[in-house]
């Protein structure tokens, strides 16, 4: 039997009990020339950062952060007060990552002890469901990239998290498009929590959502890393700016001062239509990142859709994204789907009945 099929049962367990089995790495390339590791089309890599922290700290530097908790650990994520910025008017990119993970993790799970945090679930609860005194940090590397549609106006953000515990002999990848209108870390408490603990890489994406606040009054934007800058200074790192000329913006400000535009609402790109394809793009970029991390001169691209288990799992709008990704997957990227409370549009002729 195809070894990938053995792991499809694990995808079903993910929905019910969040546990998975093992998987065989196979595939030999008989070609004389090894297959190169090529960055997928329309994707721009923004960088790779190592987050090696194994114990809680302030989380204001890369060295004091990890992939899952941004250096805060179980205790820090459970605190009712968010970590403070050294300069609240000028937060750093690393402070924004830390606080973004803090906010997004707590947004999807009950962070209170009485609700089960730290005993039933949380960074310190292992894959068998056993709670420990561990703070649950997961050191590793994070690759960040953006996806464009060729127009230069689309900015889908992707973050591929590769834990140091990644098992190259049983490679697995979890796709985590964000829920709601959240940014790239929107699935940190669901997809990342499950995948990273099991030594899987996790491909997070905002799927074209996220705030991306553009201030029309001073022409300032968010960069990809969350910091603020003028549109001109941000350049290609501009997260979103309204498609408007300076003359039109000046005229608009005179009539309607102090207005803001948001990426998901005002991009005029209807990002929802691309949720599935954006999720698939994140999967392709994740395979590139894994090959960049573990490839060699002799074997530049050891991982592909044929030998890597890929589970697409998310919640709400993210649940809709993984369903659409599975529907649109024409190349066999996805092996299993876990969609919790997905946004789904039923056919107009469909009906539902209640009863036994």
Sequence positions of predicted segments:
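C-terminal motif of bacterial Sec signal peptides marking the signal peptidase cleavage site
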Residues: 24-27
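Hydrophobic or amphipathic alpha-helical targeting/insertion segments
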Residues: 31-35, 177-184, 188-240
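Catalytic-loop region of hydrolases
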Residues: 33-172, 176, 181-192, 197-201, ...
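Alpha/beta-hydrolase active-site loop
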Residues: 232-233, 238-257, 263-300
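Extended charged low-complexity segments that act as oligomerization/scaffolding linkers
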Residues: 256-260, 302-310, 346-356
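Gly/Ala-rich beta-loop-alpha elbow adjacent to hydrolase catalytic centers
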Residues: 312-322
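A short, hydrophobic beta-strand element of the alpha/beta-hydrolase
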Residues: 338-340
């Amino acid at each position: 039997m195809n070894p990938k099929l053995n792991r499809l049962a694990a995808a079903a367990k993910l929905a019910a009990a969040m546990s998975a089995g093992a998987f065989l790495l196979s595939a030999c390339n008989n070609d004389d020339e090894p297959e190169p590791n090529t960055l997928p089309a329309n994707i721009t890599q923004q960088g790779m950062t190592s987050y090696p922290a194994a114990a809680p700290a302030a989380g204001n530097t890369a060295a004091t952060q990890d992939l899952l908790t941004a250096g805060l650990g179980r205790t820090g994520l459970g605190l009712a007060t968010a970590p403070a910025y050294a300069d609240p008017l000028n937060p750093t990119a690393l402070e924004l990552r830390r606080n973004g993970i803090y906010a997004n993790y707590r947004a999807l799970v009950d962070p209170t002890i009485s609700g089960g945090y730290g005993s039933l679930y949380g960074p310190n609860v292992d894959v068998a469901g056993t709670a420990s005194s561990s703070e649950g940090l997961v050191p590793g590397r994070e690759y960040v990239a953006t996806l464009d549609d060729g127009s230069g106006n689309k900015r889908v953000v992707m973050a591929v998290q590769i834990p140091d515990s990644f098992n190259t002999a049983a490679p697995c990848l979890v796709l985590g498009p964000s829920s709601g209108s959240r940014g790239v870390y929107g699935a940190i408490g669901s997809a990342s929590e499950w995948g990273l603990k099991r030594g899987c890489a996790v491909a997070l994406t905002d799927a074209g959502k996220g705030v991306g606040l553009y201030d029309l009054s001073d022409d300032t934007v968010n960069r990809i890393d969350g910091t603020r800058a003028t549109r001109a200074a941000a350049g290609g790192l501009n997260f979103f700016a309204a498609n408007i000329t300076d003359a039109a913006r000046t005229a608009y400000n005179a009539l309607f001062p102090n207005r803001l535009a948001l990426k998901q609402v005002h991009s005029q790109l209807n990002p929802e239509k691309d949720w599935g394809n954006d999720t698939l793009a994140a999967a392709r970029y994740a395979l590139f990142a894994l090959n960049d991390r573990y490839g060699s001169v002799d074997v530049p691209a050891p991982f592909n859709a044929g030998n890597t288990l890929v589970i697409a799992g998310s919640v709400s709008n993210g649940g809709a994204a993984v369903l659409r990704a599975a529907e649109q997957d024409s190349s066999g990227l996805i092996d299993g789907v876990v969609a919790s409370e997905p946004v789904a549009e039923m056919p107009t002729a469909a009906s539902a009945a209640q009863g036994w």
